[in-house]
């Protein structure tokens, strides 16, 4: 997943991600759009919310189409920063609804922590990534395998992007 974020120092920041994947072996196409908005309360703390829409479609004999929506508010704590690197934790919870064609929708939630890293490229741009998830998920759209507590370091839990600071 790629993410782009614009940020105002001690103010509003905007961002988002987009992903697109085509698997020819199983005729699967998937994409997601995840806009993000937040507010820097101080140099250490920010609050924000991520919205998400995800679609997966399987072609062929067993054509299946799924759609998911999610809303995930969070608090961001930056615990280390020097001239180039900033380390942070996004702590929050998310609510999702997941619908497969011709099947009832499934509602889910997650609560947990996503660690992140920002590397300053110049005065305005930073490379930013979030790697992993630690917490609890109950039928959340990124993990439809049921309920569980743990740590996830798969491709669904890694985002990479650029941040712009005004």
PLM features: residue spans?
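Cleavable N-terminal export/targeting peptides
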Residues: 1-11
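Gram-negative (and chloroplast) outer-membrane scaffold detector with strong preference
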Residues: 11, 18-20, 31, 36-114, ...
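Short, solvent-exposed loop/turn elements at domain surfaces
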Residues: 22-25
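Short acidic/His/Gly/Ser-rich catalytic and metal-binding motifs that mark active-site loops
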Residues: 98, 137-140
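Outer-membrane beta-barrel porins/channels
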Residues: 130, 139-141, 145-147
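Individual transmembrane alpha-helices with interfacial aromatic-anchor signatures
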Residues: 147-156
